[in-house]
């Protein structure tokens, strides 16, 4: 090993993005964790390997055994194998599935959920600090409870349903969470700010998160208050006849609702500016299968970066497959940081090329090189090793080139 590789491999990590379960949720499923709980994102590659005629979401042991050889060398597959070998001394292979389950259950047996997280996340993966994306804290307030996560975790507030709003479910959710009545657009913005206030009272709020790429494209318009109010009024007053039509669900279509969603997006960013909170945004590839990628490049957000120049934007997942494009954006916009969370697992080769390229054009202080983006604590092991190995290879090459 080289000196730089030794340094990287023993270094603690800041996990910039994770979705870990609360202690209570972890304990509820404690007896069900088996070899397949190590798979994480590899489930999507299993689906891809199965082909279009396979039963969607096939999860049987027989299916995993049959398909695993086809995916073991993908980024997802390699992360699973790396973690399994490091944690249990076993390659991830069908002939070891029972032994892996036994080893995993042995590791969590007799440990509280807090001790399980300490063991896997802190001691094994050496992730000393974590930004926790609770996905929907407004709909599930328990995800904001600081006693349900390690002290080293900080939270990112998120409510994506606001940005693709077509009915009153997000409004009702905000009412329940804040205890406020929402009858006007201005009251809705006030309730959104009150929800963020509630998250801040935990003392753990570190960022605002936007994952709307899973539900819509990233192009954001600049609607007026009146345009947004028209959509709000139609959604909130769905008992009325609008254009001769009365409908309970989906009171507006996507085009009509976009004005309201974009208006709330701007309100959200303004709140980040007021509180000096960074904004984490999902760009690029989407988890799972059949995602619509043409609306997800980070370049669609350039008008937002330009308008909100004092807001720090943390752009996720290397915007893969548009990594070079993101590098140019990071070089040009002082308020944009490049984030490689999840990227090493999606495509280790391209992630290494992206990091090497970015180091040639962007100040290294603008690059976040790791985030596991996992749901279960033991999955962090493989993703941490995968990132460290990739980072080490890139730095070794730079040093060999005389830099």
Where does each model-flagged region fall?
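Long, well-ordered mid-to-C-terminal structural blocks that present hydrophobic/aromatic surfaces
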Residues: 260-333, 337
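Metal-cofactor-binding active-site regions of metalloenzymes
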Residues: 2-266, 270, 332-335, 342-348, ...
């Amino acid at each position: 090993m080289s000196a730089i590789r030794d340094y990287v491999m023993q270094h603690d990590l800041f996990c910039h993005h994770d979705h870990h379960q609360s202690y209570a949720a972890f304990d509820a499923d404690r007896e069900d964790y088996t070899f397949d709980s190590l798979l994480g994102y590899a489930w999507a590659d299993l689906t891809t390997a199965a082909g279009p005629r396979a039963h969607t979401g096939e999860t049987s042991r027989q299916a995993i055994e049959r398909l695993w050889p086809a995916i073991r060398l993908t980024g997802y597959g390699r992360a699973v194998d790396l973690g399994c070998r490091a944690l249990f001394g076993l390659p991830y292979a069908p002939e070891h599935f029972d032994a892996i389950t036994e080893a995993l259950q042995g590791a969590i047996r007799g440990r509280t959920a807090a001790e399980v997280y300490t063991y896997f996340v802190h001691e094994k993966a050496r992730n000393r600090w974590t930004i926790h994306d609770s996905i929907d804290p407004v709909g599930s307030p328990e995800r904001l409870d600081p006693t349900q996560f390690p002290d080293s975790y900080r939270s990112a507030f998120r409510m994506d349903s606001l940005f693709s709003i077509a009915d009153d479910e997000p409004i009702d959710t905000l009412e329940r969470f804040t205890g406020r009545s929402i009858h006007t657009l201005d009251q809705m913005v006030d309730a959104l700010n009150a929800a963020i206030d509630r998250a801040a009272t935990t003392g753990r709020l570190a960022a605002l998160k936007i994952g709307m790429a899973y539900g819509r494209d990233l192009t954001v318009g600049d609607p007026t208050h009146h345009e947004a109010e028209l959509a709000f009024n139609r959604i909130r007053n769905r008992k009325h006849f609008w254009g001769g039509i009365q409908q309970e669900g989906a009171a507006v279509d996507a085009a009509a609702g976009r004005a309201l969603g974009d208006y709330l997006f701007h309100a959200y960013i303004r709140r980040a500016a007021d509180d000096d909170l960074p904004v984490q945004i999902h760009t690029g590839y989407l988890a799972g299968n059949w995602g619509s990628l043409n609306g997800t490049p980070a370049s669609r957000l350039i008008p937002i970066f330009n308008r909100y120049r004092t807001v720090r934007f943390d752009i996720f997942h290397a915007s893969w497959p548009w990594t070079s494009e993101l590098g140019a954006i990071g070089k040009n916009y002082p308020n944009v940081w490049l984030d490689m969370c999840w990227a090493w697992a999606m495509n280790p080769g391209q992630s290494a090329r992206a990091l090497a390229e970015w180091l040639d054009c962007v100040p290294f202080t603008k690059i976040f090189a790791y985030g596991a983006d996992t749901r279960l604590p033991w999955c962090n092991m493989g993703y941490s090793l995968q990132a460290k190995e990739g980072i080490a290879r890139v730095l070794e090459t730079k040093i060999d080139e005389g830099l």
